[in-house]
């Protein structure tokens, strides 16, 4: 299965380019220039359509470092913006056990980002008044596989759990 999204670090030796690292849970969406945004939106639309053509609601699961990493918050906000522009209803849900209530973070550009605690039903991951058909992990699971993400057979989970750092090694 090809990755849903990825980033590649490239080394420029002046006479050749070489990929040196690939990330299946890319951060840095906030580094996209405005002229590149329509291309990112188009790619997001195409990727979602391949995975779940009837997708309307998308839940983004970020890293648990939200409270301490403002740069990463901008990354998540840009990712949310891209998928909203692609026509999806997008919400941000945290699997951080320390986040017990919806929290609004203020970004440098005066925008805010609402992050809500996820809820687990018997077979689905939801937010209050929001039931997504697709869940986008922007969390590499390097601290281990949280049980709350296991056995979600009714929802598309992208990338799949076996792509997380809890399973893979460099």
Locate predicted features.
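ATP-dependent carboxylate activation and anion-phosphoryl transfer catalytic cores
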Residues: 1-108, 133
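Conserved N-proximal alpha/beta basic substrate-recognition cap immediately N-terminal to
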Residues: 66-170
């Amino acid at each position: 299965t090809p990755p849903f999204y990825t980033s590649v670090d490239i080394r420029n030796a002046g006479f050749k380019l070489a990929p040196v690292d690939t990330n299946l849970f890319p951060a840095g969406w906030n580094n996209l220039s405005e002229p590149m945004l329509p291309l990112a939106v188009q790619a997001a639309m195409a990727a979602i359509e391949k995975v779940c053509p009837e997708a309307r609601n998308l839940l983004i699961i970020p890293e648990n470092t939200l409270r301490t990493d403002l740069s990463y918050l901008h990354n998540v906000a840009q990712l949310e913006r891209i998928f909203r522009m692609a026509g999806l209803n997008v919400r941000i849900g945290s699997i951080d056990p320390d986040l017990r209530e919806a929290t609004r973070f203020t970004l440098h550009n005066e925008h805010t980002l609402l992050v809500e605690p996820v809820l687990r039903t018997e077979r689905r991951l939801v937010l209050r008044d929001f039931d997504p058909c697709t869940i986008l992990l922007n969390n590499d699971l390097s601290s281990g596989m949280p049980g709350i993400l296991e056995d979600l057979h009714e929802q598309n989970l992208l990338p799949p759990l076996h792509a997380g750092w809890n399973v893979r090694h460099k």
